[in-house]
Protein backbone atom coordinates (compact mmCIF):
# COMPACT_ATOMS: atom_id res chain seq x y z
CA UNK A 1 0.00 0.00 0.00
CA UNK A 2 2.69 2.50 0.97
CA UNK A 3 4.71 1.66 -2.14
CA UNK A 4 1.67 2.71 -4.18
CA UNK A 5 1.45 5.90 -2.11
CA UNK A 6 5.07 6.54 -3.12
CA UNK A 7 4.03 6.24 -6.77
CA UNK A 8 5.27 2.69 -7.34
CA UNK A 9 3.14 0.05 -9.00
CA UNK A 10 2.51 -2.56 -6.32
CA UNK A 11 0.04 -5.36 -5.77
CA UNK A 12 -1.02 -7.81 -3.07
CA UNK A 13 -0.49 -11.34 -4.38
CA UNK A 14 -3.88 -12.64 -3.18
CA UNK A 15 -5.93 -9.91 -4.90
CA UNK A 16 -7.84 -11.09 -7.97
CA UNK A 17 -6.76 -7.98 -9.88
CA UNK A 18 -3.03 -8.66 -9.38
CA UNK A 19 -1.30 -8.96 -12.77
CA UNK A 20 1.03 -11.80 -13.70
CA UNK A 21 4.60 -11.76 -12.45
CA UNK A 22 7.46 -11.44 -14.92
CA UNK A 23 11.18 -10.93 -15.22
CA UNK A 24 12.09 -7.55 -13.78
CA UNK A 25 9.40 -7.69 -11.08
CA UNK A 26 10.25 -7.73 -7.38
CA UNK A 27 8.31 -10.09 -5.14
CA UNK A 28 8.57 -9.41 -1.40
CA UNK A 29 7.40 -12.12 0.99
CA UNK A 30 7.40 -12.49 4.75
CA UNK A 31 7.77 -16.00 6.11
CA UNK A 32 8.57 -15.98 9.82
CA UNK A 33 9.32 -19.67 10.23
CA UNK A 34 10.67 -19.96 6.70
CA UNK A 35 8.47 -23.00 6.17
CA UNK A 36 4.92 -21.72 5.66
CA UNK A 37 3.77 -23.92 2.79
CA UNK A 38 1.69 -21.52 0.70
CA UNK A 39 4.30 -18.75 0.98
CA UNK A 40 7.06 -21.15 -0.06
CA UNK A 41 4.93 -22.24 -3.03
CA UNK A 42 4.27 -18.65 -4.17
CA UNK A 43 7.98 -17.79 -3.83
CA UNK A 44 8.79 -20.80 -6.00
CA UNK A 45 6.25 -19.65 -8.61
CA UNK A 46 7.66 -16.09 -8.56
CA UNK A 47 11.15 -17.47 -9.19
CA UNK A 48 9.84 -19.59 -12.09
CA UNK A 49 8.23 -16.45 -13.57
CA UNK A 50 11.60 -14.69 -13.49
CA UNK A 51 10.89 -12.26 -10.65
CA UNK A 52 13.52 -11.21 -8.15
CA UNK A 53 12.49 -12.52 -4.74
CA UNK A 54 13.15 -10.97 -1.33
CA UNK A 55 12.12 -12.87 1.80
CA UNK A 56 11.95 -11.39 5.29
CA UNK A 57 12.20 -14.17 7.87
CA UNK A 58 13.08 -15.16 11.40
CA UNK A 59 14.49 -18.50 10.20
CA UNK A 60 16.90 -17.89 7.30
CA UNK A 61 18.16 -21.49 7.09
CA UNK A 62 14.76 -22.88 6.06
CA UNK A 63 13.58 -23.74 2.54
CA UNK A 64 11.76 -20.55 1.56
CA UNK A 65 14.50 -18.05 2.51
CA UNK A 66 17.09 -20.24 0.81
CA UNK A 67 15.19 -19.87 -2.50
CA UNK A 68 15.21 -16.07 -2.31
CA UNK A 69 17.57 -13.76 -4.16
CA UNK A 70 17.68 -11.59 -1.04
CA UNK A 71 16.97 -12.66 2.53
CA UNK A 72 16.51 -10.24 5.39
CA UNK A 73 16.82 -11.87 8.81
CA UNK A 74 14.72 -10.40 11.62
CA UNK A 75 16.06 -11.94 14.85
CA UNK A 76 12.73 -12.21 16.66
CA UNK A 77 10.75 -15.16 17.99
CA UNK A 78 8.45 -16.61 15.31
CA UNK A 79 5.55 -19.05 15.36
CA UNK A 80 6.68 -22.63 14.65
CA UNK A 81 10.25 -21.60 13.91
CA UNK A 82 13.61 -21.66 15.57
CA UNK A 83 16.86 -19.78 15.23
CA UNK A 84 19.50 -19.56 17.94
CA UNK A 85 19.85 -15.83 17.27
CA UNK A 86 16.16 -15.04 17.79
CA UNK A 87 15.26 -12.69 20.60
CA UNK A 88 12.93 -14.64 22.92
CA UNK A 89 9.56 -13.19 23.81
CA UNK A 90 6.86 -13.68 26.41
CA UNK A 91 4.33 -12.76 23.73
CA UNK A 92 2.36 -15.57 22.10
CA UNK A 93 3.23 -17.14 18.78
CA UNK A 94 4.84 -14.79 16.24
CA UNK A 95 3.78 -11.46 17.73
CA UNK A 96 7.32 -10.16 18.22
CA UNK A 97 8.31 -10.97 14.63
CA UNK A 98 5.13 -9.34 13.28
CA UNK A 99 5.73 -6.17 15.31
CA UNK A 100 9.27 -6.00 13.96
CA UNK A 101 7.88 -6.28 10.42
CA UNK A 102 5.67 -3.23 10.93
CA UNK A 103 8.62 -1.18 12.14
CA UNK A 104 10.98 -2.51 9.45
CA UNK A 105 8.64 -1.76 6.56
CA UNK A 106 7.77 1.65 8.00
CA UNK A 107 11.48 2.52 8.16
CA UNK A 108 12.01 1.27 4.59
CA UNK A 109 9.14 3.47 3.37
CA UNK A 110 10.58 6.51 5.16
CA UNK A 111 13.99 5.82 3.58
CA UNK A 112 12.41 5.49 0.13
CA UNK A 113 10.36 8.63 0.72
CA UNK A 114 13.58 10.54 1.36
CA UNK A 115 15.54 8.92 -1.48
CA UNK A 116 12.71 9.49 -3.98
CA UNK A 117 12.05 12.98 -2.61
CA UNK A 118 8.35 12.29 -2.14
CA UNK A 119 6.54 14.36 0.48
CA UNK A 120 3.86 13.19 2.89
CA UNK A 121 1.47 15.46 1.02
CA UNK A 122 2.24 13.73 -2.31
CA UNK A 123 1.68 10.35 -0.69
CA UNK A 124 -1.61 11.50 0.81
CA UNK A 125 -2.87 12.54 -2.65
CA UNK A 126 -2.54 8.90 -3.73
CA UNK A 127 -4.51 7.60 -0.73
CA UNK A 128 -8.06 6.46 -1.48
CA UNK A 129 -10.56 9.22 -0.91
CA UNK A 130 -13.77 7.22 -0.55
CA UNK A 131 -13.54 5.85 2.97
Give a label for each model feature.
Residues 107, 113-131:
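A short, charged, Gly/Pro-tolerant segment at domain boundaries
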Residues 1-103, 109-110:
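Glycine-rich phosphate-binding loops that contact phosphosugars or nucleotide phosphates
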